[in-house]
Amino acid sequence: MSRLPSLSRLCLAIACSALLGGCVAAGDVRPFAELAPIVPVVAPVAQPTAGAIYAAGPSLNLYGDRRARDVGDLLTVNLVESTTASSTANTSISKKDATTMGAPTLLGAPLTVGGLNVLENSTSGDRSFAGKGNTAQSNRMQGSVTVTVMQRLPNGNLVIQGQKNLRLTQGDELVQVQGIVRAADIAPDNTVPSSKVADARIAYGGRGAIAQSNAMGWLSRFFNSRLSPY
């Protein structure tokens, strides 16, 4: 049996690698955002009193509500997110050129060869370009995530952070929420809408069969990248 040329063997190796690569399971479609670990808040140890009626330490407001206000308190964020965006672009360019040069004459007689005006010339050019693009996107998210107050700023605003991890039959779903909440925006039931969260970072992602089914393969990603010649 004759040996295959080097180029043919190289093409065969690339084809085999592509087939094997298609069988490899894709990784996480959307890597989860990195959140700093939630550090447990340790309550300060009560200092023994010297017999006085009042002592310095945590206080309890008997007539106040249970809204989050201190580091370590829990707060429920109601996710009410809805965004819609659309864009349309149309471009059309056209250019035409035409040039005609008559046959020169010598002493009033045209210069001909075999009865033809060989020096008579005309040129024309036509260029055109047309492009059209449309894009539309709509996102909607509803739900709730209970977060932890990580820091209380000098002006009373609360830095919050939390996540919810759901393990389903065909994969995992994760919702993460970070941001800054104004204490005045917290409702009496200790909830706040996501539209009231400043510097909000809301991430939603998944792992598993459902997430992988919505991801393009490596070959499709190549033809949709800048490296594609088409």
From Swiss-Prot:
GO terms for molecular function: cytoskeletal motor activity. Its main location: membrane. GO terms for biological process: bacterial-type flagellum-dependent cell motility. It is found in: Cell outer membrane; Bacterial flagellum basal body. A lipid is attached at C16 (N-palmitoyl cysteine). The keyword Signal applies. GO terms for cellular component: bacterial-type flagellum basal body, distal rod, L ring; cell outer membrane. InterPro entries: Flag_Lring (IPR000527). Assembles around the rod to form the L-ring and probably protects the motor/basal body from shearing forces during rotation. The basal body constitutes a major portion of the flagellar organelle and consists of four rings (L,P,S, and M) mounted on a central rod. This is Flagellar L-ring protein. The lineage of its organism: Bacteria, Pseudomonadati, Pseudomonadota, Gammaproteobacteria, Lysobacterales.
